[in-house]
Swiss-Prot record:
EC number(s) on file: 2.3.1.15
GO biological process: CDP-diacylglycerol biosynthetic process; lactation; lipid biosynthetic process; triglyceride biosynthetic process
SUPFAM superfamilies cross-referenced by the UniProt entry: Glycerol-3-phosphate (1)-acyltransferase (SSF69593)
Record's subcellular location: Endoplasmic reticulum membrane
GO molecular function, one term: lysophosphatidic acid acyltransferase activity
Superkingdom field: Eukaryota
Name of the coding gene: GPAT4
Protein name as annotated: Glycerol-3-phosphate acyltransferase 4
Family indicated by similarity: Belongs to the 1-acyl-sn-glycerol-3-phosphate acyltransferase family.
Stretch forming the signal peptide: 1-37
Protein backbone atom coordinates (compact mmCIF):
# COMPACT_ATOMS: atom_id res chain seq x y z
CA UNK A 1 0.00 0.00 0.00
CA UNK A 2 1.30 3.42 -1.02
CA UNK A 3 1.87 5.79 1.92
CA UNK A 4 1.97 9.58 1.63
CA UNK A 5 4.81 11.49 3.23
CA UNK A 6 3.79 14.20 5.72
CA UNK A 7 4.65 16.95 3.22
CA UNK A 8 2.68 15.25 0.44
CA UNK A 9 -0.24 14.74 2.77
CA UNK A 10 -0.20 18.45 3.65
CA UNK A 11 -0.28 19.42 -0.04
CA UNK A 12 -3.21 17.06 -0.70
CA UNK A 13 -5.12 18.47 2.29
CA UNK A 14 -4.46 22.07 1.20
CA UNK A 15 -5.57 21.23 -2.34
CA UNK A 16 -8.75 19.62 -1.02
CA UNK A 17 -9.50 22.63 1.19
CA UNK A 18 -8.85 25.02 -1.72
CA UNK A 19 -11.22 23.13 -4.01
CA UNK A 20 -13.89 23.02 -1.30
CA UNK A 21 -13.60 26.76 -0.68
CA UNK A 22 -13.66 27.48 -4.42
CA UNK A 23 -16.74 25.32 -4.98
CA UNK A 24 -18.49 26.91 -1.98
CA UNK A 25 -17.76 30.42 -3.27
CA UNK A 26 -18.92 29.36 -6.73
CA UNK A 27 -22.15 27.99 -5.30
CA UNK A 28 -22.90 30.89 -2.94
CA UNK A 29 -21.90 33.85 -5.10
CA UNK A 30 -22.66 32.64 -8.63
CA UNK A 31 -24.82 29.52 -9.02
CA UNK A 32 -27.43 30.18 -6.29
CA UNK A 33 -27.88 33.88 -7.24
CA UNK A 34 -28.18 32.79 -10.89
CA UNK A 35 -30.94 30.32 -10.03
CA UNK A 36 -32.99 33.04 -8.32
CA UNK A 37 -32.06 35.84 -10.73
CA UNK A 38 -30.21 37.86 -8.07
CA UNK A 39 -27.04 39.91 -8.60
CA UNK A 40 -24.59 41.24 -6.00
CA UNK A 41 -23.26 43.92 -8.37
CA UNK A 42 -19.81 42.30 -8.67
CA UNK A 43 -19.94 42.20 -12.48
CA UNK A 44 -20.86 45.89 -12.79
CA UNK A 45 -17.99 46.85 -10.47
CA UNK A 46 -15.70 44.68 -12.61
CA UNK A 47 -16.93 46.47 -15.77
CA UNK A 48 -16.32 49.94 -14.30
CA UNK A 49 -12.78 48.90 -13.31
CA UNK A 50 -12.08 47.68 -16.84
CA UNK A 51 -13.34 50.95 -18.33
CA UNK A 52 -10.88 52.90 -16.19
CA UNK A 53 -8.02 50.61 -17.26
CA UNK A 54 -8.96 50.95 -20.96
CA UNK A 55 -9.09 54.75 -20.64
CA UNK A 56 -5.64 54.79 -19.02
CA UNK A 57 -4.24 52.46 -21.73
CA UNK A 58 -5.60 54.73 -24.47
CA UNK A 59 -3.96 57.78 -22.88
CA UNK A 60 -0.63 55.92 -22.69
CA UNK A 61 -0.80 55.02 -26.40
CA UNK A 62 -1.73 58.59 -27.37
CA UNK A 63 1.21 59.89 -25.35
CA UNK A 64 3.56 57.39 -27.01
CA UNK A 65 2.33 58.39 -30.46
CA UNK A 66 2.77 62.10 -29.66
CA UNK A 67 6.35 61.52 -28.49
CA UNK A 68 7.17 59.82 -31.81
CA UNK A 69 5.25 62.42 -33.85
CA UNK A 70 2.83 59.84 -35.21
CA UNK A 71 -0.94 59.87 -35.48
CA UNK A 72 -2.94 57.05 -33.97
CA UNK A 73 -4.97 54.95 -36.38
CA UNK A 74 -8.71 55.50 -36.04
CA UNK A 75 -10.97 53.03 -37.83
CA UNK A 76 -13.87 54.39 -39.87
CA UNK A 77 -16.91 52.77 -38.32
CA UNK A 78 -19.24 53.92 -41.11
CA UNK A 79 -16.85 53.25 -44.00
CA UNK A 80 -14.03 55.12 -45.66
CA UNK A 81 -16.24 56.76 -48.30
CA UNK A 82 -18.85 59.39 -47.47
CA UNK A 83 -22.07 58.28 -49.14
CA UNK A 84 -25.26 60.32 -49.32
CA UNK A 85 -28.58 58.45 -49.64
CA UNK A 86 -29.34 59.49 -53.25
CA UNK A 87 -31.01 57.60 -56.08
CA UNK A 88 -29.40 56.39 -59.30
CA UNK A 89 -31.32 58.97 -61.35
CA UNK A 90 -30.27 61.88 -59.11
CA UNK A 91 -26.59 60.90 -59.22
CA UNK A 92 -26.55 60.48 -63.00
CA UNK A 93 -28.28 63.85 -63.43
CA UNK A 94 -25.63 65.42 -61.20
CA UNK A 95 -22.86 63.95 -63.37
CA UNK A 96 -24.58 65.18 -66.53
CA UNK A 97 -25.09 68.62 -65.02
CA UNK A 98 -21.41 68.97 -64.08
CA UNK A 99 -20.18 67.72 -67.44
CA UNK A 100 -22.48 69.54 -69.85
CA UNK A 101 -23.72 73.08 -70.32
CA UNK A 102 -26.92 71.85 -71.96
CA UNK A 103 -30.21 71.91 -70.10
CA UNK A 104 -31.17 68.59 -68.64
CA UNK A 105 -34.47 68.56 -70.51
CA UNK A 106 -32.58 68.55 -73.83
CA UNK A 107 -30.24 65.69 -72.97
CA UNK A 108 -30.49 62.52 -75.07
CA UNK A 109 -31.65 59.16 -73.68
CA UNK A 110 -28.06 58.09 -73.15
CA UNK A 111 -24.91 60.08 -72.53
CA UNK A 112 -21.40 58.73 -72.55
CA UNK A 113 -20.82 60.38 -69.16
CA UNK A 114 -23.32 57.91 -67.62
CA UNK A 115 -20.53 55.34 -67.74
CA UNK A 116 -18.67 57.28 -65.06
CA UNK A 117 -21.48 56.62 -62.56
CA UNK A 118 -21.20 52.84 -62.92
CA UNK A 119 -17.39 52.97 -62.90
CA UNK A 120 -17.43 55.01 -59.72
CA UNK A 121 -19.90 52.65 -58.04
CA UNK A 122 -17.72 49.69 -58.96
CA UNK A 123 -14.59 51.32 -57.53
CA UNK A 124 -16.43 52.31 -54.34
CA UNK A 125 -17.64 48.74 -53.88
CA UNK A 126 -14.11 47.34 -54.30
CA UNK A 127 -12.68 49.83 -51.78
CA UNK A 128 -15.51 49.92 -49.25
CA UNK A 129 -18.04 47.12 -49.61
CA UNK A 130 -20.86 47.72 -47.14
CA UNK A 131 -21.96 44.06 -47.16
CA UNK A 132 -18.97 41.71 -46.77
CA UNK A 133 -17.43 43.80 -43.97
CA UNK A 134 -20.54 42.94 -41.90
CA UNK A 135 -19.29 39.34 -41.76
CA UNK A 136 -15.97 40.12 -40.02
CA UNK A 137 -15.14 41.42 -36.55
CA UNK A 138 -15.85 45.08 -35.85
CA UNK A 139 -12.75 47.26 -35.60
CA UNK A 140 -12.00 49.00 -32.30
CA UNK A 141 -10.79 52.56 -31.90
CA UNK A 142 -8.58 51.69 -28.95
CA UNK A 143 -6.77 48.63 -27.63
CA UNK A 144 -8.76 46.54 -25.15
CA UNK A 145 -5.75 44.56 -23.83
CA UNK A 146 -7.02 41.35 -25.43
CA UNK A 147 -4.37 40.97 -28.12
CA UNK A 148 -1.62 42.79 -30.00
CA UNK A 149 -3.59 42.94 -33.24
CA UNK A 150 -4.49 46.60 -32.73
CA UNK A 151 -2.94 48.93 -35.32
CA UNK A 152 -1.43 51.07 -32.56
CA UNK A 153 0.59 48.27 -30.90
CA UNK A 154 3.88 50.02 -31.67
CA UNK A 155 3.01 52.73 -29.14
CA UNK A 156 2.53 50.31 -26.25
CA UNK A 157 4.85 51.14 -23.37
CA UNK A 158 6.55 48.82 -20.92
CA UNK A 159 3.80 49.47 -18.36
CA UNK A 160 1.13 48.51 -20.88
CA UNK A 161 3.05 45.37 -21.83
CA UNK A 162 3.21 44.32 -18.18
CA UNK A 163 -0.50 45.11 -17.79
CA UNK A 164 -1.29 43.05 -20.89
CA UNK A 165 0.70 40.11 -19.49
CA UNK A 166 -1.13 40.39 -16.18
CA UNK A 167 -4.41 40.42 -18.09
CA UNK A 168 -3.46 37.23 -19.92
CA UNK A 169 -2.76 35.50 -16.59
CA UNK A 170 -6.08 36.66 -15.14
CA UNK A 171 -8.11 35.67 -18.19
CA UNK A 172 -6.50 32.28 -18.83
CA UNK A 173 -5.54 31.15 -15.32
CA UNK A 174 -8.49 32.46 -13.30
CA UNK A 175 -11.45 33.51 -15.46
CA UNK A 176 -11.22 30.69 -18.03
CA UNK A 177 -11.29 27.77 -15.52
CA UNK A 178 -14.08 29.49 -13.58
CA UNK A 179 -16.12 30.10 -16.73
CA UNK A 180 -15.58 26.56 -18.03
CA UNK A 181 -16.82 25.19 -14.71
CA UNK A 182 -19.91 27.40 -14.88
CA UNK A 183 -20.56 26.59 -18.55
CA UNK A 184 -20.20 22.86 -17.89
CA UNK A 185 -22.61 23.19 -14.95
CA UNK A 186 -25.16 25.19 -16.94
CA UNK A 187 -25.06 23.05 -20.09
CA UNK A 188 -25.09 19.78 -18.12
CA UNK A 189 -28.08 20.91 -16.07
CA UNK A 190 -29.85 22.05 -19.25
CA UNK A 191 -29.31 18.74 -21.06
CA UNK A 192 -30.14 16.56 -18.04
CA UNK A 193 -32.96 18.79 -16.78
CA UNK A 194 -34.79 19.10 -20.11
CA UNK A 195 -34.37 15.37 -20.77
CA UNK A 196 -35.94 14.50 -17.40
CA UNK A 197 -38.73 17.07 -17.83
CA UNK A 198 -39.43 15.58 -21.26
CA UNK A 199 -40.62 12.35 -19.60
CA UNK A 200 -43.24 14.16 -17.52
CA UNK A 201 -46.86 14.03 -18.73
CA UNK A 202 -48.04 17.13 -20.57
CA UNK A 203 -49.68 19.65 -18.28
CA UNK A 204 -49.11 22.70 -16.12
CA UNK A 205 -46.54 21.00 -13.91
CA UNK A 206 -44.40 20.08 -16.93
CA UNK A 207 -44.63 23.66 -18.25
CA UNK A 208 -43.71 25.03 -14.82
CA UNK A 209 -40.68 22.75 -14.50
CA UNK A 210 -39.57 23.36 -18.09
CA UNK A 211 -39.74 27.14 -17.64
CA UNK A 212 -37.69 27.17 -14.46
CA UNK A 213 -35.12 24.64 -15.72
CA UNK A 214 -34.56 26.78 -18.82
CA UNK A 215 -34.33 30.05 -16.86
CA UNK A 216 -32.00 28.57 -14.24
CA UNK A 217 -29.61 27.07 -16.80
CA UNK A 218 -29.53 30.14 -19.05
CA UNK A 219 -28.77 32.39 -16.08
CA UNK A 220 -25.87 30.15 -15.08
CA UNK A 221 -24.59 30.28 -18.68
CA UNK A 222 -24.84 34.08 -18.61
CA UNK A 223 -22.52 34.06 -15.58
CA UNK A 224 -20.17 31.74 -17.47
CA UNK A 225 -19.63 34.55 -19.99
CA UNK A 226 -19.49 37.27 -17.33
CA UNK A 227 -22.36 38.81 -19.29
CA UNK A 228 -23.47 42.23 -18.07
CA UNK A 229 -26.90 42.83 -19.59
CA UNK A 230 -29.07 45.93 -19.34
CA UNK A 231 -32.73 45.35 -20.22
CA UNK A 232 -34.82 48.35 -21.26
CA UNK A 233 -38.64 48.72 -21.40
CA UNK A 234 -39.37 45.32 -19.92
CA UNK A 235 -43.10 46.08 -19.98
CA UNK A 236 -42.88 45.33 -23.74
CA UNK A 237 -41.57 41.80 -23.24
CA UNK A 238 -43.08 39.26 -25.68
CA UNK A 239 -46.32 37.61 -24.62
CA UNK A 240 -47.91 34.26 -25.38
CA UNK A 241 -49.16 33.80 -28.92
CA UNK A 242 -46.72 36.34 -30.34
CA UNK A 243 -43.44 36.27 -32.24
CA UNK A 244 -40.25 37.79 -30.84
CA UNK A 245 -37.85 38.92 -33.59
CA UNK A 246 -34.35 40.24 -32.93
CA UNK A 247 -31.15 41.11 -34.77
CA UNK A 248 -28.66 38.24 -34.77
CA UNK A 249 -24.99 38.49 -33.81
CA UNK A 250 -24.20 35.23 -32.08
CA UNK A 251 -25.70 32.01 -30.66
CA UNK A 252 -25.43 33.67 -27.24
CA UNK A 253 -28.28 35.99 -28.35
CA UNK A 254 -30.50 33.10 -27.29
CA UNK A 255 -28.94 33.00 -23.81
CA UNK A 256 -29.19 36.79 -23.47
CA UNK A 257 -32.93 36.81 -24.22
CA UNK A 258 -33.87 33.47 -22.64
CA UNK A 259 -32.34 34.44 -19.29
CA UNK A 260 -35.06 37.12 -19.05
CA UNK A 261 -37.99 35.24 -20.59
CA UNK A 262 -39.30 31.84 -21.64
CA UNK A 263 -39.53 31.18 -25.38
CA UNK A 264 -40.22 28.48 -27.92
CA UNK A 265 -37.36 28.71 -30.40
CA UNK A 266 -37.06 28.30 -34.14
CA UNK A 267 -33.68 27.64 -35.67
CA UNK A 268 -31.47 25.62 -37.98
CA UNK A 269 -30.38 22.11 -37.03
CA UNK A 270 -26.76 22.02 -35.86
CA UNK A 271 -24.31 19.24 -35.22
CA UNK A 272 -21.78 18.75 -32.44
CA UNK A 273 -22.33 20.30 -29.03
CA UNK A 274 -25.10 22.55 -30.33
CA UNK A 275 -26.93 19.53 -31.74
CA UNK A 276 -26.83 17.71 -28.39
CA UNK A 277 -28.33 20.75 -26.66
CA UNK A 278 -31.04 21.14 -29.34
CA UNK A 279 -32.14 17.51 -29.11
CA UNK A 280 -32.41 17.74 -25.32
CA UNK A 281 -34.30 21.06 -25.32
CA UNK A 282 -36.98 19.92 -27.76
CA UNK A 283 -38.02 17.16 -25.34
CA UNK A 284 -39.20 19.67 -22.74
CA UNK A 285 -40.46 22.53 -24.90
CA UNK A 286 -42.04 22.77 -28.39
CA UNK A 287 -39.00 24.22 -30.16
CA UNK A 288 -38.86 23.97 -33.96
CA UNK A 289 -35.57 22.89 -35.55
CA UNK A 290 -35.28 22.63 -39.34
CA UNK A 291 -32.76 21.91 -42.08
CA UNK A 292 -32.21 25.07 -44.15
CA UNK A 293 -31.50 23.15 -47.36
CA UNK A 294 -34.71 21.11 -47.22
CA UNK A 295 -37.65 22.82 -48.96
CA UNK A 296 -40.18 20.50 -47.30
CA UNK A 297 -38.76 21.48 -43.90
CA UNK A 298 -39.41 25.15 -44.63
CA UNK A 299 -43.05 24.47 -45.54
CA UNK A 300 -43.46 22.37 -42.40
CA UNK A 301 -41.96 25.16 -40.26
CA UNK A 302 -44.37 27.72 -41.75
CA UNK A 303 -47.31 25.44 -40.99
CA UNK A 304 -46.18 24.78 -37.40
CA UNK A 305 -45.59 28.49 -36.78
CA UNK A 306 -49.10 29.32 -37.99
CA UNK A 307 -50.62 26.67 -35.73
CA UNK A 308 -48.49 27.82 -32.79
CA UNK A 309 -49.44 31.52 -32.90
CA UNK A 310 -53.14 30.73 -33.29
CA UNK A 311 -53.08 29.28 -29.77
CA UNK A 312 -52.75 32.30 -27.46
CA UNK A 313 -51.82 30.06 -24.53
CA UNK A 314 -48.57 28.94 -26.16
CA UNK A 315 -45.15 30.50 -25.59
CA UNK A 316 -43.90 33.38 -27.72
CA UNK A 317 -41.67 32.18 -30.55
CA UNK A 318 -38.11 33.50 -30.71
CA UNK A 319 -36.89 34.03 -34.29
CA UNK A 320 -33.84 35.68 -35.83
CA UNK A 321 -35.15 36.62 -39.31
CA UNK A 322 -31.71 37.56 -40.70
CA UNK A 323 -30.94 33.84 -40.82
CA UNK A 324 -27.22 34.33 -40.12
CA UNK A 325 -24.90 36.12 -37.70
CA UNK A 326 -23.98 39.74 -38.48
CA UNK A 327 -21.19 41.62 -36.67
CA UNK A 328 -23.58 43.89 -34.73
CA UNK A 329 -22.84 47.00 -36.79
CA UNK A 330 -25.95 46.61 -38.94
CA UNK A 331 -29.24 44.80 -39.49
CA UNK A 332 -29.60 42.96 -42.80
CA UNK A 333 -32.64 41.75 -44.71
CA UNK A 334 -35.32 39.97 -42.68
CA UNK A 335 -36.75 36.82 -44.25
CA UNK A 336 -40.46 37.38 -44.80
CA UNK A 337 -41.67 33.95 -43.60
CA UNK A 338 -42.30 34.90 -39.97
CA UNK A 339 -44.15 38.06 -41.05
CA UNK A 340 -46.66 36.25 -43.26
CA UNK A 341 -48.56 34.39 -40.57
CA UNK A 342 -50.43 37.39 -39.14
CA UNK A 343 -49.19 37.24 -35.54
CA UNK A 344 -48.27 40.13 -33.26
CA UNK A 345 -44.55 40.82 -33.59
CA UNK A 346 -42.46 41.90 -30.60
CA UNK A 347 -39.23 43.50 -31.92
CA UNK A 348 -36.09 43.31 -29.78
CA UNK A 349 -32.84 45.21 -30.42
CA UNK A 350 -29.57 43.76 -29.08
CA UNK A 351 -26.42 45.88 -29.05
CA UNK A 352 -23.07 44.55 -27.77
CA UNK A 353 -20.18 46.67 -26.52
CA UNK A 354 -17.16 45.37 -28.51
CA UNK A 355 -14.49 46.89 -26.27
CA UNK A 356 -14.99 44.14 -23.66
CA UNK A 357 -15.11 41.26 -26.14
CA UNK A 358 -16.24 40.51 -29.68
CA UNK A 359 -19.55 38.63 -29.50
CA UNK A 360 -19.80 38.07 -33.26
CA UNK A 361 -19.65 34.43 -34.37
CA UNK A 362 -17.88 34.02 -37.70
CA UNK A 363 -19.22 30.52 -38.33
CA UNK A 364 -17.16 30.12 -41.51
CA UNK A 365 -13.98 30.57 -39.47
CA UNK A 366 -14.71 29.15 -35.99
CA UNK A 367 -16.59 26.13 -34.74
CA UNK A 368 -18.95 26.38 -31.78
CA UNK A 369 -16.48 25.13 -29.15
CA UNK A 370 -13.67 27.37 -30.46
CA UNK A 371 -16.03 30.34 -30.48
CA UNK A 372 -17.13 29.70 -26.89
CA UNK A 373 -13.49 29.46 -25.78
CA UNK A 374 -12.85 32.83 -27.42
CA UNK A 375 -15.79 34.26 -25.50
CA UNK A 376 -14.58 32.78 -22.24
CA UNK A 377 -11.11 34.29 -22.64
CA UNK A 378 -12.46 37.79 -23.31
CA UNK A 379 -12.98 40.30 -20.52
CA UNK A 380 -16.76 40.17 -20.50
CA UNK A 381 -19.85 40.28 -22.69
CA UNK A 382 -21.58 43.63 -22.20
CA UNK A 383 -24.81 44.36 -24.04
CA UNK A 384 -28.05 46.31 -23.97
CA UNK A 385 -31.45 44.84 -24.86
CA UNK A 386 -34.41 46.99 -25.84
CA UNK A 387 -37.93 45.55 -25.90
CA UNK A 388 -39.83 47.59 -28.48
CA UNK A 389 -43.63 48.08 -28.50
CA UNK A 390 -45.52 45.27 -30.29
CA UNK A 391 -46.18 45.73 -34.01
CA UNK A 392 -48.87 44.28 -36.27
CA UNK A 393 -49.16 44.10 -40.02
CA UNK A 394 -51.22 46.93 -41.48
CA UNK A 395 -54.02 46.41 -43.99
CA UNK A 396 -52.11 47.88 -46.94
CA UNK A 397 -48.80 46.14 -46.11
CA UNK A 398 -47.39 42.98 -47.59
CA UNK A 399 -45.04 40.70 -45.63
CA UNK A 400 -41.88 42.27 -47.09
CA UNK A 401 -42.95 45.82 -46.20
CA UNK A 402 -43.89 44.72 -42.68
CA UNK A 403 -40.54 42.97 -42.25
CA UNK A 404 -38.69 46.09 -43.41
CA UNK A 405 -40.67 48.28 -41.01
CA UNK A 406 -39.80 46.03 -38.07
CA UNK A 407 -36.16 45.87 -39.18
CA UNK A 408 -35.93 49.65 -39.39
CA UNK A 409 -37.34 50.02 -35.87
CA UNK A 410 -34.75 47.58 -34.48
CA UNK A 411 -31.88 49.28 -36.34
CA UNK A 412 -32.96 52.73 -35.18
CA UNK A 413 -33.24 51.69 -31.52
CA UNK A 414 -29.95 49.76 -31.48
CA UNK A 415 -27.97 52.41 -33.36
CA UNK A 416 -27.30 49.96 -36.21
CA UNK A 417 -27.04 50.49 -39.97
CA UNK A 418 -30.23 49.45 -41.79
CA UNK A 419 -29.25 47.41 -44.87
CA UNK A 420 -31.52 45.86 -47.52
CA UNK A 421 -28.96 43.20 -48.49
CA UNK A 422 -29.56 39.52 -47.75
CA UNK A 423 -27.34 38.02 -45.05
CA UNK A 424 -27.28 34.86 -47.17
CA UNK A 425 -24.56 36.55 -49.24
CA UNK A 426 -22.25 35.38 -46.44
CA UNK A 427 -22.39 31.88 -47.95
CA UNK A 428 -23.68 32.39 -51.49
CA UNK A 429 -22.71 34.31 -54.61
CA UNK A 430 -24.55 37.48 -55.53
CA UNK A 431 -27.70 36.57 -57.46
CA UNK A 432 -28.13 37.85 -61.00
CA UNK A 433 -31.34 39.57 -59.89
CA UNK A 434 -29.28 42.04 -57.81
CA UNK A 435 -27.25 42.95 -60.89
CA UNK A 436 -30.35 43.16 -63.07
CA UNK A 437 -32.00 45.51 -60.58
CA UNK A 438 -29.50 48.27 -61.37
CA UNK A 439 -29.99 47.67 -65.09
CA UNK A 440 -33.76 47.94 -64.67
CA UNK A 441 -33.46 51.21 -62.75
CA UNK A 442 -31.25 52.72 -65.45
CA UNK A 443 -33.49 51.42 -68.25
CA UNK A 444 -36.54 52.83 -66.49
CA UNK A 445 -34.88 56.23 -66.30
CA UNK A 446 -33.99 56.17 -70.01
CA UNK A 447 -37.39 54.89 -71.13
CA UNK A 448 -39.10 57.41 -68.86
CA UNK A 449 -37.18 60.29 -70.46
CA UNK A 450 -38.07 58.99 -73.92
CA UNK A 451 -41.79 58.71 -73.09
CA UNK A 452 -41.85 62.19 -71.56
CA UNK A 453 -40.38 63.70 -74.72
CA UNK A 454 -42.76 61.70 -76.93
CA UNK A 455 -45.74 63.19 -75.09
CA UNK A 456 -44.37 66.68 -75.47
Amino acid sequence: MFLLLPFDSLIVNLLGISLTVLFTLLLVFIIVPAIFGVSFGIRKLYMKTLLKIFAWATLRMERGAKEKNHQLYKPYTNGIIAKDPTSLEEEIKEIRRSGSSKALDNTPEFELSDIFYFCRKGMETIMDDEVTKRFSAEELESWNLLSRTNYNFQYISLRLTVLWGLGVLIRYCFLLPLRIALAFTGISLLVVGTTVVGYLPNGRFKEFMSKHVHLMCYRICVRALTAIITYHDRENRPRNGGICVANHTSPIDVIILASDGYYAMVGQVHGGLMGVIQRAMVKACPHVWFERSEVKDRHLVAKRLTEHVQDKSKLPILIFPEGTCINNTSVMMFKKGSFEIGATVYPVAIKYDPQFGDAFWNSSKYGMVTYLLRMMTSWAIVCSVWYLPPMTREADEDAVQFANRVKSAIARQGGLVDLLWDGGLKREKVKDTFKEEQQKLYSKMIVGNHKDRSRS
